[in-house]
C-alpha cells in the first residue's frame, strides 16, 4: 500500500496502517481487488455495535465495555483477527440476542487493540466485505454465527450515468466540507484522492451525519449504483441543512448589527433632544427640589443638597455618573432626617409586652424598663448601646422585637455574621460605579424613622479581610459621643444615630474587638433552667406549635411533668430551639391521628413521648448513697445548665503518688493538689499519721471521662473526698458542695450558683455547702426554687469538714497503718 498524508475527518485519523506505525489507510483500487478476492470463513464471532455501522474498506475505532465484547475481541486478536460486525436494532439492549441485531453486517479485520485504564477496550477495525447471518450457532461466551457473503452488483464500466453520480458525490462532499465549520478543509484532499468507486460511496456514507437506521439501510443495498443514488440524496439534504443554517446565522449577525446601529442612532438622537430640551430630566430634578423644601433639614444639609442637585443639572444624562447622582439624591430625600417615632412611656404596658413574649430574662427586662423610666423623665436622653451575650437560642435576637413593640418604635435588624467588607457598614464612595450606602443608612431608610430599635446580630462573628475591618467601622456607630454625626462614604454627610437604640447580640464576648466591647453595656444572658424551659414550653412553644400544626388546646394538652421529661431526657442546650423541635414532633404525631381519624391520647402521656421521641438518652445523675469512703457530690455548671458531679477517691499501698483522672483541666488538677497538700499540712488536726502519705498511693477520679471538665469550683468537694478516704468516715447524706480552696485553708466563691442549686434540687440533694460570699447569689434566686434546701455558708475548709463528715465509719472500713 502507498503512504498517504495524515488527515482528520470527524475525529478519525486517516493514514496507511502497518505493523511499525500507527497508521490508518485509505483504500486504493489494488487494495479493493485484493480484499474482494479473499474468501470468507464459514462461521465468525459476531460483535454487535450499539450506535454505528461499519462499511467495507472504512476504518473506525470502537470502544468495548461489555464482558462478552471484550472476550470476543481478545480471543479474535489472539487468533485470526477476523470477526463479523453487525449493528443492534435497539442500542439500549445490554445483551442483544439473535433477534436484536441486523442480519446484514460487515466482515472486519482487527488492526489494533488498546486496553484503557478504566478496564474497557478500544479496537481499531477495518471493514472487508458485507455478509448475511445464516444461522446463529451459539450465544456463549459470545455470539457465533454461520455466514454467507453478500455480493455487490456493480454497474457496467461504460455506464456514464454512474460516472456522473460519482462525480456529483465528490462535488457535494467537497461542498459539505466547505459549508461545515466542524470538518477541516484538509478533508477535501482525501475525497479527491479516493480512486475506488465502492470505497468512495462507503467512505462518504460512513462519515455522513446519519442515524444508525439510515446507515444500515445504505449498507443493505446490494446494487452499487442504487447505493450511490441513495447516498447522493442524503448528501443533498445535508447540504441544504448546512446552507440554511449558515443563512440563518448570517441573518442573525446582520440583525444584531442593525440593532446596534439603531441603538447608537437612538442614543445620539436622545442626547440631541436632551441638549435641546431636556424635558424629562428637568421635571425630575424640579420634583426633587420641591420635595426638599418639605424636609426638616438644617442649613448645612439644605446647602449640601442644593449643591448636589445643581451638579446633577450640569451632568450628561447618558454618563454613568448621572445615574449614581440620581440614586444619591433619591436616597438623600428618602432618609428620615429628624423624623422620630413617638415613644410610649406607659411602663406597665412595656412590662406587660416584655413578659408576654419572653419568660425569665429579668435582667434584660429590668434594664429596658429603667431606660424607659429615665427617658420619660428626661426626653433628650441618648439611647443606650446594649450587648446581649449568651449561648444560642436564649432569645437574644427576639427580645429586640419585643423591646421595639414596648417602646412603640420601628424594628430593624442586620446580620453581621461573616461580614468582612468595611463598605458594608460605611458604604462605597460615589466615584465607584454601582456605589451604594452602607447597611446602617439603608436600614434607617427602610425603617422610616431615625430612632428605631436596631439589632446588630452576631456582632462577634465579624471578620476582617482585604476590604478593611468592619468591626473598626462600627466603633463610630456604637460610640454615643460620636454617632450623632455618623459619616457614610456614599452619603458624604454626618447622620445623627444618637437616638437609635442599638442592641448587639453575641455568643462569645472574647471574640469582639476590645475597643468595640468597651463601647457597649454588656448584659449576660445565661442558659434557661429546667424550670424556666418548662414554663416557656407551656406558655409559648406548645401553643405556638399547636397553631402551626392546625390543632387547638381541645385537640391536645400536655402537663408540666411531661414537658420536664422532654427537657431532661431529650435536650441538652442552653436555649429552647431543640426543645421546640421535640414538641413539634409530639404534636405532629397527634395531628396525624386527627387527620386519619385514629384514636389518640388528648393529653400527652409519658408513653406517648417515648413512642414518638424514643428512649431518653440524656437522663441526669441522681444522688447516690454515702456508704463508700471518698465519694462526695459536687456541683457543676455548663453552658446548658447545672448538674451534679461525683468526686471519687481510692487508696492503695504504694509510695505516696497522687493520680488524677477523668479528663480534667489544669485548674481542677491544681485543686486536687492543693487539697492534698492542705491535708498533709494539717494531718495532726485531722487525726492522720504523716506516714500514711509515704505508704499509700491516692487515686482521685471524676466520672464521665469522655467529657472535658475544668474550673476551681470542685475544690472543697475534692478536699472532703480525700479526708473521707483517709479517715474512712461517712459523708453526710443528701449533701452537695461547691467552692474554691486555697493553701491557707480559705473557701472562695464560684459562679453559676443558680444553675447549680436547681441541678442539686432535681438530683434529690437536701443540703448544700457554699462560700459565705455566694450568699448574695442565693438572695437573687426566686424562693420557690429554694424550697426544701438547707444552705451552709462557710469561710474556712475546717468548717466544710465539720459539716460534711460524720463520726461514723463507712461499711467495711479499711485500717490504714
From Swiss-Prot:
- Catalytic positions? 713, 756
Report the catalytic activity: Hydrolysis of proteins in presence of ATP
- Family annotation (Gene3D superfamilies): 1.10.8.60, 1.20.5.5270, 1.20.58.1480, 3.30.230.10, LON domain-like, P-loop containing nucleotide triphosphate hydrolases
- EC assignment: 3.4.21.53
Q: What class of enzyme is it?
A: hydrolase
* GO MF, any single term: ATP-dependent peptidase activity
Q: What induces it?
A: By heat shock.
* InterPro entries in alphabetical order: AAA+_ATPase, ATPase_AAA_core, Lon_bac, Lon_bac/euk-typ, Lon_lid, Lon_proteolytic, Lon_Prtase, Lon_prtase_N
Q: Where is the Lon proteolytic domain?
A: 626-807
Q: Name one GO cellular component term.
A: cytoplasm
- Ranges for domain Lon N-terminal come to 44-239
> One GO biological process from the UniProt record?
cellular response to heat
Question: What keywords sit in the KW lines?
Answer: ATP-binding, Cytoplasm, Hydrolase, Nucleotide-binding, Protease, Serine protease, Stress response
Entry-linked Pfam families? AAA, Lon_C, Lon_lid, LON_substr_bdg
Principal location listed in the UniProt entry: cytoplasm
Q: Binding positions for ATP?
A: 390-397
Family of this protein? Belongs to the peptidase S16 family.
The entry's function note states: ATP-dependent serine protease that mediates the selective degradation of mutant and abnormal proteins as well as certain short-lived regulatory proteins. Required for cellular homeostasis and for survival from DNA damage and developmental changes induced by stress. Degrades polypeptides processively to yield small peptide fragments that are 5 to 10 amino acids long. Binds to DNA in a double-stranded, site-specific manner.
Oligomeric and partner information: Homohexamer. Organized in a ring with a central cavity.
Matching NCBIfam families: lon
Protein name from the UniProt record: Lon protease
What gene is this protein a product of?
lon
Amino acid at each position: 500500500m502507498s503512504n498517504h498524508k495524515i488527515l482528520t475527518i470527524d475525529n478519525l485519523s486517516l493514514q496507511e496502517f502497518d505493523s511499525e506505525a500507527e497508521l490508518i489507510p485509505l483504500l486504493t483500487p489494488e487494495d479493493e481487488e485484493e480484499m474482494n478476492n479473499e474468501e470468507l470463513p464459514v462461521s465468525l464471532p459476531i460483535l454487535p455495535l450499539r450506535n454505528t455501522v461499519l462499511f467495507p474498506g472504512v476504518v473506525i475505532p470502537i470502544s468495548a465495555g461489555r464482558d462478552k465484547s471484550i472476550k470476543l475481541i481478545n480471543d479474535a486478536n489472539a487468533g485470526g483477527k477476523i470477526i463479523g460486525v453487525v449493528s443492534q436494532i435497539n442500542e439500549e439492549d445490554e445483551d442483544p440476542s439473535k433477534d436484536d441485531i441486523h442480519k446484514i453486517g460487515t466482515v472486519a479485520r482487527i488492526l489494533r487493540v488498546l486496553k484503557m485504564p478504566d478496564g474497557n477496550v478500544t479496537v481499531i477495525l477495518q471493514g472487508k466485505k458485507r455478509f448475511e447471518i445464516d444461522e446463529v450457532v451459539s450465544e456463549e461466551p459470545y455470539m457465533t454465527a454461520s455466514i454467507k457473503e453478500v455480493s455487490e452488483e456493480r454497474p457496467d464500466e461504460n455506464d456514464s450515468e454512474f460516472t456522473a453520480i460519482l462525480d456529483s458525490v465528490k462535488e457535494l462532499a467537497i461542498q459539505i466540507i466547505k459549508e461545515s465549520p466542524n470538518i477541516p478543509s484538509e478533508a477535501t484532499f482525501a475525497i479527491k484522492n479516493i480512486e475506488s468507486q465502492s470505497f468512495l460511496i462507503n467512505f462518504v456514507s460512513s462519515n455522513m451525519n446519519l442515524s444508525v437506521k439510515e446507515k444500515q439501510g445504505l449498507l443493505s443495498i446490494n446494487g452499487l449504483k442504487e447505493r450511490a443514488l441513495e447516498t447522493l440524496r442524503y448528501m443533498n439534504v445535508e447540504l441544504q441543512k448546512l446552507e440554511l443554517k449558515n443563512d440563518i446565522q448570517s441573518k442573525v449577525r446582520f440583525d444584531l448589527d442593525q440593532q446596534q446601529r439603531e441603538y447608537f442612532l437612538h442614543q445620539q438622537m436622545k442626547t440631541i433632544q436632551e441638549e435641546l430640551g431636556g424635558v424629562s430630566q428637568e421635571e425630575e430634578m424640579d420634583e426633587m427640589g420641591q420635595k426638599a423644601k418639605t424636609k426638616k433639614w438644617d442649613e448645612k444639609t439644605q446647602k449640601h443638597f442644593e449643591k448636589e442637585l445643581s451638579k446633577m443639572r450640569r451632568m450628561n444624562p447618558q454618563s454613568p455618573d448621572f445615574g449614581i447622582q440620581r440614586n444619591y439624591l433619591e436616597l438623600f430625600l428618602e432618609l428620615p432626617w429628624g423624623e422620630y417615632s413617638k415613644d410610649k412611656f406607659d411602663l406597665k404596658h412595656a412590662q406587660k409586652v416584655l413578659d408576654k413574649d419572653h419568660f425569665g430574662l429579668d435582667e434584660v427586662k429590668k434594664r429596658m424598663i429603667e431606660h424607659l423610666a429615665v427617658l420619660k423623665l428626661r426626653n433628650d436622653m441618648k439611647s443606650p448601646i446594649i450587648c446581649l451575650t449568651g449561648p444560642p437560642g436564649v432569645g437574644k435576637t427576639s427580645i429586640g422585637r419585643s423591646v421595639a413593640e414596648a417602646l412603640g418604635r420601628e424594628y430593624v435588624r442586620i446580620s453581621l455574621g461573616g461580614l468582612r467588607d468595611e463598605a458594608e457598614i460605611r458604604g462605597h464612595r460615589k466615584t465607584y460605579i454601582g456605589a451604594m450606602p452602607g447597611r446602617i443608612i439603608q436600614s434607617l431608610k427602610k425603617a422610616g424613622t431615625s430612632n428605631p430599635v436596631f439589632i446588630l446580630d452576631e456582632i462577634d462573628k465579624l471578620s476582617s479581610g482585604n476590604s478593611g475591618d468592619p468591626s473598626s467601622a462600627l466603633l463610630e456607630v456604637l460610640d454615643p459621643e460620636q454617632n450623632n454625626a455618623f459619616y457614610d462614604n456614599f452619603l458624604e454627610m454626618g447622620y445623627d444615630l444618637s437616638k437609635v437604640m442599638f442592641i448587639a447580640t453575641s455568643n462569645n464576648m472574647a471574640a469582639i474587638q476590645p475597643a468595640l466591647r468597651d463601647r457597649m453595656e454588656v448584659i449576660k444572658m445565661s442558659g434557661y433552667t429546667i424550670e424556666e424551659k418548662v414554663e416557656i414550653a407551656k406558655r409559648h412553644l406548645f401553643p405556638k406549635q399547636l397553631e402551626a400544626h392546625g390543632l387547638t388546646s381541645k385537640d391536645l394538652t400536655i402537663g408540666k411533668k411531661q414537658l420536664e421529661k422532654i427537657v431532661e431526657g431529650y435536650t441538652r442546650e442552653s436555649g429552647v430551639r431543640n426543645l421546640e423541635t421535640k414538641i413539634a414532633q409530639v404534636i405532629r404525631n397527634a395531628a396525624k391521628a386527627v387527620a386519619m381519624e385514629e384514636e389518640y391520647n388528648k393529653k400527652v402521656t409519658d408513653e406517648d413521648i417515648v413512642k414518638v421521641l424514643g428512649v431518653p438518652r440524656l437522663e441526669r445523675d441522681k444522688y447516690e448513697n454515702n456508704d463508700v469512703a471518698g465519694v462526695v457530690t459536687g456541683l457543676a455548671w455548663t453552658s446548658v445548665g447545672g448538674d451534679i458531679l461525683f468526686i471519687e477517691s481510692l487508696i492503695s499501698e504504694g509510695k505516696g503518688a497522687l493520680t488524677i483522672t477523668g479528663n480534667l483541666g489544669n485548674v481542677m488538677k491544681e485543686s486536687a493538689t492543693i487539697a492534698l497538700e492542705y491535708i498533709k499540712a494539717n494531718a495532726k488536726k485531722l487525726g492522720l499519721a504523716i506516714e500514711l502519705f509515704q505508704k499509700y498511693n491516692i487515686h482521685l477520679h471524676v466520672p464521665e471521662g469522655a467529657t472535658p471538665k475544668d474550673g476551681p469550683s470542685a475544690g472543697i468537694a475534692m478536699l472532703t473526698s480525700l479526708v473521707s478516704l483517709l479517715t474512712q468516715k461517712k459523708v453526710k447524706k443528701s449533701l452537695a458542695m461547691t467552692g474554691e480552696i486555697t493553701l491557707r485553708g480559705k473557701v472562695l466563691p464560684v459562679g453559676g450558683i443558680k444553675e447549680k442549686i436547681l441541678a442539686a434540687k432535681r438530683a434529690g440533694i437536701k443540703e448544700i455547702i457554699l462560700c459565705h460570699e455566694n450568699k448574695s447569689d442565693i438572695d437573687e434566686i426566686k424562693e420557690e426554687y429554694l424550697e426544701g434546701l438547707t444552705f451552709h455558708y462557710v469561710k474556712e475548709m475546717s468548717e466544710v469538714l465539720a459539716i460534711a463528715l460524720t463520726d461514723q465509719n463507712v461499711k467495711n472500713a479499711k485500717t490504714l497503718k
